Amino acid sequence: MKTVKDVSEITGISIRTLRYYDEIGLLKPTKLTEAGYRLYDNKAVEKLQEIMFFRELEIPLIDIKKIMDNPNYDKEQALLTQKSLLEQKRNRLNGIIELITDVMKAC
């Protein structure tokens, strides 16, 4: 079992964020000690790595929770949906970059 400090050091996720994930039910510690310390097993750390992956894809925490709480969730479908959203965002950003370039040429 790993303490919240250990998990924080391993993953780079702050202790505050780990506590927040616990508060919102996204990542519950495997065990609480009598003193109230959070302990995590390897399975919980693996789940945290999945959460980190989804966050890297800019998936909101509420959606990550829905995905992970659904026993029948389709990881591939979730990734396809996020890919589509990121492509739309990229297209918007490309449009903004083109606009800025045009404005700069006019200066």
Task: Name what the model sees in each region.
Residues M1-K66:
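Basic helix-turn-helix/winged-helix DNA-binding cores
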